[in-house]
Amino acid sequence: MRIIAGEFRGRVLKAPKGSNTRPTTDRVREALFSALASARGGFDGAIVLDAFAGSGALSFEALSRGAATAHLFERDRAALAALEGNVRALGLSANVARVHRRDVLKNPPISARPPFDLVFLDPPYAFDAADVLGMVAQLAAAGALANDALVVYEHAAPSGDSVDSAAAELGFALASRKKYGDTVVDILRRA
């Protein structure tokens, strides 16, 4: 797994050992970041929340392309070890790549200031969409989500209906949906 573009282009990232995580493939990341760059007009200065960071590939790609700060949340020990190793390998300071060892669903970063511009949600597929998007709704209600923020939600293809209903119920609108095999990547906005 490698960083596709920007300052860290070509740098290899380590993924956690085992089957608890499934890193987003290079192909999917490349398509996603092209769509995000078009929707956002680039990444310069973005404040990123990576709620289920795993290896951190999504945040590191955003940082490589000009994001200012990434808050990476992870609770799995093996994933945390890989994540922290990737931060060190890229030479990122703790002010740029802020790693948080905690369950973001139980303890969301509602006091974050400045608010998040870009949110990555790549939870285990078994997680309920209402719980995952409910956490983002809590951020919005607390002022920790920018009004024009983009929320990227990667999920299993069969769960599209539950994501749609949870998004609508919680005040988010689908901006785009792309399917890559068994994986779907949605880009959501506040409605």
What function would you assign to each model-found segment?
Residues M1-A191:
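Class I S-adenosyl-L-methionine-dependent methyltransferase catalytic core
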